[in-house]
Amino acid sequence: MNYKDSGVDLEAGRSFVETLKEKAPSIGGFGGMFEVPRGYEEPVLVSGTDGVGTKMNICRVARDYTTIGIDLVAMCVNDIITCGAKPLYFLDYVSTRKIDDKVADIMVGILKGCELAGVKLIGGETAENFRQR
């Protein structure tokens, strides 16, 4: 079995990344890099990962995916703040049945959330999984 037979459209994925790079030029590689700004003495980087959980059910019912990305960034940023750290960067993971307009709305929300939080989107993954509901 190959990617296409499993329902993954590699060309759509590449196109999606290129579109996102226009708004977040640091993404696209296999690892996110972040340069610690000058002025930090003995910096310790704090990272956090969270999810939106059952809120995706609300998006499905409302047929509105425009704010869930903002919520995702907020969950992660808030966790970092509770550690007494300043959020600096964000990495995302989006798993979907198919890369489509809903995923684009989620990503626009993630970019907006990053802007509101003052963090940079430095990378992540958008994965197609045809068996996902």
Q: What would you call each of these model-derived segments?
A:
Residues 19-133:
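Glycine-rich phosphate/pyrophosphate-binding loop regions near the starts of catalytic domains
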